[in-house]
Amino acid sequence: MTKYVILLAVLAFALHCDAKRFTRCGLVQELRRLGFDETLMSNWVCLVENESGRFTDKIGKVNKNGSRDYGLFQINDKYWCSKGTTPGKDCNVTCNQLLTDDISVAATCAKKIYKRHKFDAWYGWKNHCQHGLPDISDC
């Protein structure tokens, strides 16, 4: 039993070490590469900074409804991603696919959420970005 606990601890540490934290300008460059609308770029950066702290592997605390949020964009598993190994829900992805350093899958899902709900789908944006956005002019 002790061997399994140690193994799990080592694996958890190894997985966390692989996580990426974007710099603000690094995030802007990656979002541009993935085709995000330049006129909304400050909003996306603000959202990511307030939802995940720019960490690709962020898993949020359990929400009141029992759901969780995953990845850079903190995408919710109640509607958008499947907790299992089979892709599903509205983005047709697993939640683990949203936790990788390659954010292309997460970005596609985030764009889908935005198309349907705008930024109102994210509390991080609603609570922190409506009245002030980060300056990304140097990026």
Curated annotation (Swiss-Prot):
Domain C-type lysozyme: 20-139
Recorded family membership: Belongs to the glycosyl hydrolase 22 family.
Pfam families referenced in this protein's UniProt entry, alphabetically: Lys
Annotated protein name in UniProt: Lysozyme
InterPro entries named in the record: Glyco_hydro_22, Glyco_hydro_22_CS, Glyco_hydro_22_lys, Lysozyme-like_dom_sf
Leader sequence segment: 1-19
Enzyme Commission number(s): 3.2.1.17
Keyword Repeat found: no
Organism: Hyalophora cecropia (Cecropia moth)
GO BP annotation list: defense response to bacterium; killing of cells of another organism
Function summary: Lysozymes have primarily a bacteriolytic function; those in tissues and body fluids are associated with the monocyte-macrophage system and enhance the activity of immunoagents.
Reaction equations catalysed: Hydrolysis of (1->4)-beta-linkages between N-acetylmuramic acid and N-acetyl-D-glucosamine residues in a peptidoglycan and between N-acetyl-D-glucosamine residues in chitodextrins
Keyword Disulfide bond: yes
Gene Ontology MF term list: lysozyme activity
